[in-house]
A protein has these predicted regions:
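ER/secretory pathway lumenal C-terminal domains and tails of membrane proteins involved
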Residues: 5-382
Length: 382
């Protein structure tokens, strides 16, 4: 993997890209979705694609360029064309075709079944060898409502899908917000730090993770860069990435347990503990530690599970004690945070009880009751 950025901002706008080099593939350009709103990105994406196949982005720059009426231009070129019926509809409902509507909220794409088979993507077990004839993309926002406009990045995504024809994989980083998924999250299959676009409805088919590829990526291909070295300082940005990596390990482990691959699940858990150690990256609900503990319990590794859940419970307990050290007025303001940590500790105690860690459960349940009763007593009348 190598990355490059233009240094002369006076000659051209800053350009970021990653080029993936493997075997005979030469350079395969990877598009930056967050930059897809920038006009120059489309032009540079084709100019600077090295030796990669650029036909995946065939839209001419004039459609996207500096023209302030890009959307109108796109509609005139793409949607109006020879479609007289649509043209009349827009004339009746719009003013000078300013587009108060999108004529459809669904796009249907014919699926090349042989290309899908050649692609190497996981075909959900529920389908057997049956691949759907068509892929339906419903244009909806993050709240499930029909979209009223398509932006440049979304048009780019749609065209990439249309032109790639499953001959090459198309991915989206797992850190991209759902508001930028163009309603296609039900076609994603996770292979690591990225979702792969598929022609399948992975939600309905219960096939959201390709455990084989994800296991290989996490266990054999990921490079962690020394975050396991004791005593190093990890800043906020790196810590967030560490949280993400621990979470995806728990997702993989959960899928492996579901598939009955317990040996691989245990190996993945132990590897995560080794490469993302708690002495540098403390256990936290936000980084999947609770799920790690539960997975260890499910695999019969109670000692390892107790270590994690004990640290989580102690953290929740310390927060509750600290909030109770405030005066009554301050505690009233912070009451929601106190209750939140109490709910975490309650969940942790219930997990201990579920897997028969009775001594540990009793230790924390007693303190939970005492602290919560103190909180209720102090907040009466507040």
């Amino acid at each position: 993997i190598k990355s490059s950025a233009a240094s002369d901002v006076y000659k051209r706008q800053t350009w970021d890209r990653v080029e993936y080099v493997e075997g005979q593939n030469e350079y395969i350009p990877i598009r930056t979705e967050m930059k897809a709103f920038i006009d120059s990105y489309f032009k540079q994406a084709n100019e600077l694609a090295a030796q990669g196949d650029t036909t995946i982005l065939s839209l001419v720059h004039s459609i996207f360029g500096e023209n302030p009426y890009e959307l109108k231009e796109i509609i005139n070129r793409w949607m109006l064309g020879k479609n007289d019926q649509l043209k009349e509809l827009l004339k009746k409902t719009g003013k000078d075709i300013q587009l108060p509507l999108i004529p459809t909220d669904s796009i249907v794409m014919k699926v090349d079944k042989e290309a899908v088979r050649r692609s190497g993507m996981k075909i959900p077990e529920a389908l057997g060898d049956s691949i759907p004839e068509y892929m339906t993309i419903t244009l909806r926002d993050a709240n499930g409502n029909p979209k009223r406009a398509l932006y440049k990045s979304e048009l780019m995504m749609l065209e990439m899908l249309a032109n790639a024809n499953w001959e090459r994989p198309i991915y989206m980083a797992i850190t991209v917000g759902s508001e930028n998924h163009l309603g296609m999250g039900n076609h994603f299959m996770q292979e690591g730090l990225a979702y792969r676009f598929t022609p399948f409805d992975t939600d309905k088919l219960d096939s959201k993770i390709d455990s084989e590829k994800m296991y290989d990526n996490l266990m054999n291909k990921f490079k962690f860069g020394g975050i396991d070295k004791p005593g190093i300082y990890i800043d906020e940005n790196v810590m967030r990435m560490c949280y993400t990596h621990r979470r995806i390990f728990t997702q993989l482990v959960g899928q492996l347990i579901k598939e009955g691959q317990k040996d691989k699940a245990l190996a993945a858990l132990d590897y995560a503990e080794k490469m993302i150690p708690s002495y540098n990256i403390p256990y936290d609900w936000a980084n999947g530690a609770f799920q790690m503990a539960e997975s260890y319990y499910q695999l019969g590794q109670n000692e390892k599970a107790n270590k994690i859940i004990d640290e989580l419970a102690n953290k929740s307990l310390e927060y509750m004690i600290w909030y109770l050290s405030l005066n009554d007025n301050q505690l009233a303001i912070a009451g929601e945070n106190f209750v939140y940590n109490a709910s975490l500790l309650d969940a942790e105690v219930r997990l201990m009880e579920k897997y028969k860690s009775e001594e540990l459960a009793k230790h924390y349940s007693t303190q939970l009751d005492q602290l919560y009763n103190e909180y209720v007593t102090r907040m009466k009348g507040k």
